[in-house]
C-alpha cells in the first residue's frame, strides 16, 4: 500500500473544513503516511496543484473559516476522460488514497475515483446539512449560529418599529437551516420546500400575530422557493399595511470562525477517516449519527434523497404562532 494520501475540499466552502484538513494531515503523519494537499478541489488534480502537507502551515488553520486549500465546483469531472486523467495524475505522484471533504457532488466525484481504483474516504462538509445518514455535516452548526445571530439582531430593530422581516437562508433543497433557525429564534412563520405559502396566506398570518399584540413578526424562508424576495416582502406590506423588510442572509453563512462543535466534529471524522485508510478501506463515507461516528458506503449515501421533516415544520409554525 502506498503511503501517500491526498486531501481535498470541494464544492461550497463550509466552516470547519480547515479543522478537517489539519487533523487529516496530523493523523496521517502519526500513522506513518505522507499527506498531500490538493488545491481547489477536483480541478486541482487535473491542474496538478498538489503539494506535500509538510510544505504548508496546516497546524495553524483549524480556527479559520473557509478552506485554506481552496475549493471549486468542477462539472467537467463528470466526464469519464477527466476522471481517467485524474487517476493517471494521482498514480504518477504515487497517491493511492484520497480523503474528500464536501457535499453530494464531492461524494459523487469520490465514488467515481473509487470505482477506478483510488481508495476514497468522504467527509460531509457543507453548511446545508443535506447529506444522508448523518445528523450533522461539518459547517452546519456554525452557519446556523450565524443565522440565529442575524435574526436576533433583526428582531431587536423589528420590535422597535413594529415591523415584519422576511429572511431568506441557504440550504439549497434542504430545509434544516431554516427549520432549526426558526426553532432557535421563535420565527413566527416558516416557509420551506415542504410548506410553501402564498403572499396572501403569509399576510393573513402576519395580521393575526400583530392582532395578538406581538411587536414584530419574522418570516424565515429556505432559498430556491421565491422568485423574488423583495417583491414577496413588498406584497406582504401592500396587503397588511405593516412595514415589511427583506433580508437575504447570503454568503455570511459560509464564513466565520467555526464553532467548537464543528471543529470537534471535523477532528473526529478526520481521525476516523485515517483509521479506515490505515485499514486499507475505500468507498466509505463518515457520518455522525445517533451520537456516534459511523461509516456508510458512499454509493448508498448518494443514492438516497434528502430527508424531509415536514411534520416538524408544521409543528414549529403552530407553536411559534402562539
Swiss-Prot record:
Which cysteines share a disulfide bond?
none
Its GO biological process terms?
A: canonical glycolysis; fructose 1,6-bisphosphate metabolic process; fructose 6-phosphate metabolic process
Please give the catalytic activity noted in the UniProt record: beta-D-fructose 6-phosphate + ATP = beta-D-fructose 1,6-bisphosphate + ADP + H(+)
From the record, what ranges are coiled-coil? Answer: none
InterPro entries to which the protein is assigned, alphabetical:
ATP_PFK, ATP_PFK_prok-type, PFKA_ATP_prok, Phosphofructokinase_CS, Phosphofructokinase_dom, PKF_sf
Activity regulation, per record: Allosterically activated by ADP and other diphosphonucleosides, and allosterically inhibited by phosphoenolpyruvate.
Question: Tell me, what does this protein do in biology?
Answer: Catalyzes the phosphorylation of D-fructose 6-phosphate to fructose 1,6-bisphosphate by ATP, the first committing step of glycolysis.
Q: What is this protein called?
A: ATP-dependent 6-phosphofructokinase
Query: Can you name the source organism?
Result: Mesomycoplasma hyopneumoniae (strain J / ATCC 25934 / NCTC 10110)
GN (gene name): pfkA
